[in-house]
Each structure stands twice: as structure tokens, then as C-alpha cells.
């Protein structure tokens, strides 16, 4: 949650989307080559950020069922002028590749083609400009997720409706309609304002959680106050309701990847990117991470969610049932998570593209 909160401060009026599990798995790869205080910082950060982080990055898709796909693209690119330790290369296996950074354009195309392949063509260009010829090592991270809704929205019900970017700015969106679905829902009143949480299941064992503030501009208060602990507490308050859901189709495509170096430094990982970086388990030379790039893509429509980021059967009596109507027509937060609570993606949607 902390990386996401740092990003939304830097991008207050933009759509933001990251994949925490992808970022953490990449940090785990780096940790294989870290020593001393660098290893201590990395180990502590990974432990504090996500207790469910897999020990091996290749296990990221263990809990993803046949009806969904999760493909991660995490890679360390190291200079071919450096002799890396065999023990390090054995640990990370396919997650490492040597390149000639002096041939900047070729290296750029190599990285972009790899990311395109790993994300099923949804992310075509992680790098929009060549890396510096002085680069010694670069970490890139991308992820692709696709899952079918457990309760698909009917395409013939989709209509054009208003979306309030702010109280004074209104645009239009394609609004999807899901009726009479039994979903996990709660409305919560906190000191900073009221909001609704709705858990929308996919086929299998993952779901999208929407946090929708009551106030059109209430997203800013949620951003300031949400924590991992509060999110878990709020989700524990969910209960089954009959819901009429009005949700916009939306797509988020990043034009530039996030460089997470300054954000991770702000969060305490100071001994990875600077003078005190110790990657002596990686190689004998002094080396530091110069870039940590992360990019994502998401497409939410009537049939499925696709990101280049379960529930049981509920029964009701045949009687008059009060249905809660949820209109997602202004900025909101969303998470895609699995049944363990592991957040695969977290984002903010505030500006239809």
C-alpha cells in the first residue's frame, strides 16, 4: 500500500495502477544478490510489505485457476562487462540476462520485445527511450492478468452515463449494468467520510474490490487515510447483499513507466540505489540499481478484466428482496486480490481515457 500511496501523491489527478506482487517479487530477486545492510533492508521491507510474498518468483501464479491467467514479467538486466557469480545466476535462473548497454537502441528493443511477449502484447513499450550507455544494471517489472467475471454484465444493458471527474468537471462513460447479483458489500462511515466497498468476484478465486466514496471528491480523503490494516478491517465487515451495480467500462494504459527508485528510497531502501549498495553476492564489482521501472495495463469490460497488472454460491428466499443500488460514477479506488488477501493490483480511477 505504501508504494501506491507515494505514487498518488506524485500523480494526484491521474489514473494510477501498480502490481504490488510483481514489485515485491522483483525485490526478492535483487535480495538474492544482496549482502550486509542492503540485504537487511530488502529482507525487512519485503517481510513488512507482504507476508504472503512467494519465496520464488516463478510461483506467482500458483493460486490462479484455469479460468484466469497471471503472467509476470520481472527481469534484471546486467552489463555484459561484469562477471556475475555463478551462485547468484543459479538462484535467479531465467530472471537475469546480460546485455551490452553500449548498444542502447538494441538493448531497448530487446527489453521491450520481452515485455510484450510476457504480457500477451498488452504492453508494447516499457522503454520509450534508450538507456544510458553508463547503465550497469536495470530492473524491469510488468504483469498481465485476465479473468472472467463470475457474474458477467449484459452488453445490451450498457448505456452512456455521466462520470464526475470532480464536482465541476463531468464527462461520459459506457456504464455497465449488473442486476440482482448477490455480492459482498458494506457501507462504512469514518471520521474522514463515508464510502462503500463492494467485492465483485471473478470465476475462480480472485475478485475486484471497489472503494467508492460517498462524496464526488472524497477519494482524496480515502487516499490519505487508507492503510493495509484498515483495508483488511473493512473487508472483514463485508456481507452478502442483493446489488444492482452500475460500473463504468474502463481502460488504463500508461504512456511512461514508473521509475520507482525515488519512491523506494523514500520508503527506506536507501542502501540499494546509492553509494552504500552491497550486491557482493551478485558480483565482485561495486554495483547499484540505477532504474527500477514498472508499468501496467488494465481493461475492464462486460465479460472480463484484463490487466497488464472465490466466492461460494449464495442463495436467497423467493420473496421480496431489498436491492442496494451502487453507482460508480465518480473517482474510486480498486484492488484485484486472491482469496488469501494478496493484492495483485491496486489502482485509482479518476479520469476516463
Swiss-Prot record:
Short name of any one Pfam family annotated for the protein: Serpin
GO cellular component assignments: extracellular space; host cell cytoplasm
Site residues, Reactive bond: 318-319
Primary location recorded for the protein, binned into one broad class: host cell
Keywords for the protein's UniProt record, in alphabetical order: Early protein, Host cytoplasm, Protease inhibitor, Serine protease inhibitor
GO terms of molecular function: serine-type endopeptidase inhibitor activity
Annotated InterPro entries: Serpin_CS (IPR023795), Serpin_dom (IPR023796), Serpin_fam (IPR000215), Serpin_sf (IPR036186), Serpin_sf_1 (IPR042178), Serpin_sf_2 (IPR042185)
PROSITE patterns given in the database record: SERPIN (PS00284)
Subcellular location: Host cytoplasm
UniProt function note: Plays a role in mediating viral host range. May act to inhibit a caspase independent form of apoptosis to allow efficient virus replication in infected cells.
PANTHER family per the UniProt record, alphabetical: GH10112P-RELATED, SERINE PROTEASE INHIBITOR, SERPIN
Family membership noted in the UniProt record: Belongs to the serpin family. Poxviruses subfamily.
Protein name (Swiss-Prot/TrEMBL): Serine proteinase inhibitor 1
Top-level taxonomy: Viruses, Varidnaviria, Bamfordvirae, Nucleocytoviricota, Pokkesviricetes
